[in-house]
Amino acid sequence: MTQSQNKKVSVPDNHSVTVKCTATFVPRYNASKKRRFITQIKSAKITVSGYGFSWKKSPTITKRVIDGGRTGEILCLGVIKNPSGFIKQVSLSFEFYCNTGGGIEVR
């Protein structure tokens, strides 16, 4: 199951760029708890867009299943740059919640 979440990052001239996290989750049913939980974050991709910004190099991505499997957390640490030479360090956390039916929701 794939879900995406966007976050805004401020850059010069009162602009902001969009950092988008797209992740694929594996939810499984737990009979004793009578609900689904995230058992694995299969993949995570993080992109940046707006005002010519891009990653200076691929960001470091850390995937964690927390809160007993109710939440998938993607941590992103990287540097964005634009053609003018402006650079900015970006550190973001994206959280996704697994509802009782196994659907993945943005928090």
Predicted feature residues:
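Mature secreted bioactive peptide module from preproproteins
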Residues: 1-107
